Swiss-Prot record:
The chain crosses the membrane at residues 194-214, 260-280, 327-347, 365-385, 415-435, 544-564, 596-616, 696-716. The keyword Lipid metabolism applies. Disruption phenotype: Knockout mice show reduced olfactory behavioral sensitivity, electro-olfactogram signals and neural activity in the olfactory bulb. Conditional knockout in olfactory sensory neurons results in impaired odor discrimination. This is Anoctamin-9. GO terms for molecular function: calcium channel activity; channel activity; chloride channel inhibitor activity; intracellularly calcium-gated chloride channel activity; phospholipid scramblase activity.
Length: 747
């Protein structure tokens, strides 16, 4: 047993002295030499069972080459841990070819982050059953574990400040402090934000171009002057005939984002998404090559950590169980059906809300239903996010994947699929189903035979889709960001105030520093994962259905400028330190981005074809309108389009005609559809336009996908400079081995 400076003592329940662990020959260490701190309640030292478990766990760590130090305050006991230099040397040796004195691993070696990564891995992955740190936390032996912030002051000054919002990010310093995985996240986020600038500018131009035609649009003119056209009531909440001219303002607003520029913008965004990903691949290759990680192997890294943790570690064979895969598939499909069911819940809400609002806001019932429906959808998203994460975790545990990286990939796929349906199921309903299964006036489809299904706004379904996207995206970018920042900030301030008020803050500099880290907000495995997921969903809103909401890239740009600094402030000032992890790419998220890009092409093509009025306008202009027969027609080719696009319904065929308010002399009302006047069946014109819609979708998707493929081929994933550097490194290693081999032969 060493002197009191180099050892600490547990006190048993009867005052018995239990040796904690000898510090060996090491002298007391400075605060910045301790990487990880375990925390336990002070009362656990008086419980023999817990004290023995703590001692056993720490002795297990000591046998792996770790050193410890214990400090106490009035309530807690802190165990500082650091790895011995022999552990670092072992790690370096495992990842290097001993013949390559200048290997890429040595060049990319960062002792501080490596030591932290090793300590964190070993503490969390002791192999003895019932002896893992997670088990000890559940048993109350330990409370938590955290990594110490140290040397972060420069990042606070130049990065984690709101006033630095428009300053470049210090990626190299982020990498040295948080590791390559976090550095790649901020590199990707910064590049994504930069690339949003052209998309936001083009989207704004498309939106503003609608203002240029705000009053001059032929369709708007016809709607605003149609005082003699009465529209049939939309639902049970409306019992009067609206003059078409009352829709004048909404018709003009709809034209802001439902015009010819929308098609060009959708094609532009398909090209933008491809160029963004291709140039990102090049930027990623350049960054990881500068870090000497281009050929780094994640599986080798994990195996090296496992061997440091236990020299007797054995590889787990890859196994595939068709039974478990089938069960997981069925459960996943069930959850997807549940997400789709959420859309049906919203349908029911909107129908019932229409009946409720009819007595409160008679003039704007449809708008009120759309707005409140979007808010309800946002609340459902918040709730289902927690449910989806729990379900995805359970599915991954049931699957029993091997390495951590493999588990992370499978969890990412499952969680994203569930989140995608949670966020976009309602938008899919509004874009492609709303107003298309309602029947016609006098014979409407009803929910449970009582309530008439809602219909699109009289100005078109694009207005409903625009409002839904604007509200959901606006709430996610504002309310979610406020909660994401204010909750950790207030929680951190509250912990510090509580500790100071009760006199728990020590005057000892080292213990005070540990306490400062302890009172920061806790982190978990999903801290960085959640940031990525948030950005993936935002990217989906920015590309999918962007034809209906050209301002989405602009909102995303403003949000990301805030998001970068918000995440920086959280990680440096408000949260405990993340485990520095190595990485050479953003992993499965790249495949997620590519999938979203393909879905965006399909969705935007269908929105233009089926949701907007683009195809009916084009068909009328060249097949039914005045320009078809009269090439010298001087007026607008869309003249009389509004009257042509509205079907006729005779009010005498209403079952409840007596309930209509006013306009008793109205014998004919109009509604949005293409139906015959005599029997209300779908007209020949409907089927002709449907054929054109389907043709457009096929042509648009093939054209957009061809552009994506050409752009992907034209822009190489890896710069030639990086290829040459990697090739030179391989050449140098081979030459070095040749010299090494020659020396060995000579001996």
């Amino acid at each position: 047993m060493q002197d009191d400076e180099s050892s600490q003592i547990f006190m048993g329940p009867e005052g018995d002295q239990l040796p904690l662990v000898e510090m060996g020959s090491c002298k007391p260490e400075a605060s910045d030499q301790w990487d990880c701190v375990l925390v336990a309640d002070l009362q656990t030292l008086k419980i023999q069972k817990h004290a023995q478990k703590q001692l056993q766990f720490l002795e297990n760590l000591e046998s792996n080459g770790f050193h410890f130090k214990m400090l106490k305050d009035q309530k807690k006991v802190f165990f500082g841990i650091r790895a011995d230099s022999d552990v670092i040397d072992k790690y370096r040796t495992l990842l290097m070819n001993p013949e390559d004195s200048g290997s890429r691993d040595e060049q990319s070696f960062n002792i501080a982050t490596t030591r932290i990564r090793i300590v964190s891995f070993v503490v969390n992955n002791k192999l003895k059953p019932g002896d893992t740190f997670e088990d000890l936390v559940k048993d109350g032996v330990f409370e938590t574990m955290f990594l110490l912030h140290k040397g972060e002051q420069n990042l606070k000054n130049i990065w984690a400040r709101w006033r630095n919002m428009f300053e470049p990010q210090p990626i190299d310093e982020i990498r040295e402090y948080f590791g390559e995985k976090v550095a790649l996240y901020f590199t990707w986020l910064g590049w994504y934000t930069y690339m949003l600038v052209p998309a936001a500018v083009v989207g704004l131009i498309v939106f503003l171009s609608g203002f240029a035609l705000f009053d001059s649009s032929q369709i708007s003119k016809e709607i605003c002057s149609a005082n003699d056209i009465f529209m049939c009531p939309l639902g049970d909440h409306s019992h009067r005939y609206l003059r078409l001219s009352e829709m004048c303002t909404f018709a003009k607003l709809t034209h802001l984002f439902d015009n010819e520029g929308t098609v060009l913008f959708a094609i532009f965004m398909a090209l933008w998404a491809t160029v963004f990903l291709e140039i990102w691949k090049r930027k990623r290759a350049h960054e990881v090559q500068s870090w000497k990680l281009y050929e780094w192997d994640e599986e080798e890294e994990e195996m090296a950590l496992e061997l440091i943790n236990s020299p007797h570690y054995k590889l787990k064979d890859h196994r595939h169980s068709y039974l478990s895969s089938t069960i997981i598939l069925i459960l996943s499909l069930f959850m997807i059906c549940l997400m789709i069911g959420m859309a049906h819940v919203l349908v029911v809400y909107r129908v019932l809300a229409g009946a409720l609002f009819s007595s409160l806001v008679k003039q704007q019932v449809t708008t009120a239903v759309v707005v409140t429906g979007a808010v309800v959808h946002y609340i459902i998203i918040v709730i289902m996010t927690k449910v989806n994460k729990y379900v995805a975790l359970k599915l991954c545990k049931f699957e029993e994947s091997g390495t951590f990286s493999e588990q992370e990939r499978k969890f990412t796929v499952k969680f994203f699929i569930l989140q995608f349906f949670a966020h976009f199921s309602s938008l899919i309903y509004i874009a492609f189903i709303l107003g298309r299964i309602n029947g016609h006036p006098g014979k409407s489809t009803r929910l449970a035979g009582l309530w008439k299904l809602e219909e699109c706004h009289l100005s078109g379904c694009m207005m409903d889709l625009f409002i839904q996207m604007a509200i959901i995206m606006g709430l996610k970018q504002t309310l979610s960001n406020c909660v994401e920042y204010l909750c950790p900030l207030l929680a951190h301030k509250w912990r510090l105030m509580w500790a100071s008020k009760h006199g728990h803050m020590s005057k000892d500099p080292e213990l005070k520093e540990w306490q400062r880290n302890y009172y920061m907000n806790p982190i978990n495995t999903f801290s960085l994962f959640d940031e990525f997921m948030e950005m993936m969903i935002q990217y989906g809103f920015t590309t999918i259905f962007v034809a209906a909401f050209p301002l989405a890239p602009l909102l995303a740009l403003f949000s990301n400028l805030v998001e970068i600094r918000l995440d920086a402030i959280k990680m440096v000032r408000l949260q405990r330190r993340l485990v520095p992890r190595k990485a050479k790419d953003i992993g499965t998220w790249l495949q997620v981005l590519e999938t979203i890009g393909v879905l965006a092409v399909i969705a935007n093509g269908m929105v233009i074809a089926f949701t907007s009025e683009f195809i009916p306008r084009v068909v009328y202009k060249y097949h039914y309108g005045p320009c078809r027969t009269n090439r010298t027609f001087t007026d607008d080719c869309l003249t009389n389009y509004v009257n042509h696009s509205l079907s006729v319904f005779y009010t005498k065929h209403f079952n409840d005609h007596s309930r209509m308010e006013g306009q008793e002399n109205v014998t004919v009302c109009r509604y949005r559809d293409y139906r015959n006047e005599h029997d209300y069946n779908l007209s020949e014109q409907f089927w002709f336009i449907l054929a054109i819609r389907l043709t457009f979708v096929i042509l648009f998707e093939h054209f957009a996908l061809c552009i994506k493929l050409i752009a992907a081929w034209f822009v190489p994933d890896v710069p030639q400079k990086v290829k040459n550097e990697v090739l030179q490194e391989k050449y140098d290693r081979i030459r070095h081995r040749m010299r090494f081999s020659s020396r060995s032969t000579d001996v």
